[in-house]
Amino acid sequence: MPRIVATIVTLAFFSSTFGQNPAINELDVLLEDIDTMSATVLQLIIESDGGVLEESEIQMHLKKPDGFYWETIDPFPELIVTDGTYLWNYQPDLEQVVIEHWDNSESELAAQLLNGQTGNIAEEYMVQLSSDDESSEFELTPIDENSVYEQITISFIASNLDMIHLDNKNGEQTVWHFQNLEKNHLLADSLFVFEPPEGIDVIDNATN
């Protein structure tokens, strides 16, 4: 499963079951307001020595409950899109698309956040909030010592998603910075269904 989908499909509302945690309550308020979202995403993958391994420009669209579109524009074109049933991974340079069944239950934390599947957050993470009049920053620290993450940070400015920062235990960091963000606008369902262009190879693992 592509790393980005395993890490970013879910940030929209929280279950009221966790109302006793003020930090989760506040995150709930911010995420609950998102029904659709579009943004330009600047992605940085940073090595343990601080060097930038990769910098990418991405266009993303999100539509609850299951629609997710993630197109890498530069440097290596790639499209990942799901309607909640199937996932298409289209690589123009290879002239191929791989089709898989999509299972949200197998997605990682950020994916679960973006589509509201947050039932295990309070059980698996310590959540702390730092905020002022303009911004809110949530630090999620895994309770399980075997987690691949050291910490996950989610930042908002003026109630809009600004950044997700994944700090892995191997020292690698992934940063998504959201720009030109638009939310709760009309997005067609057809945006989240990929129609393969003629002449490309189709690897359909969903029917195998």
Task: Tell where the protein language model's regions lie, with residue ranges.
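Sec-dependent signal peptide recognition
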Residues: 2-10
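N-terminal signal peptide c-region/cleavage motif recognized by signal peptidases
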Residues: 14-15
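N-terminal mature ectodomain segment of secretory-pathway/periplasmic proteins
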Residues: 26, 31-84
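Short, solvent-exposed helix-to-loop capping segments enriched in aromatics
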Residues: 31, 106-121
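Short hydrophobic/aromatic-rich beta-strand segments that constitute the beta-sheet cores
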Residues: 39-41, 68-72, 87-90, 99, ...
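An acidic-aromatic
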Residues: 59-109, 171-174
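Gly/Pro-enriched, hydrophobic low-complexity segments
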Residues: 98, 118, 122-125, 131-206
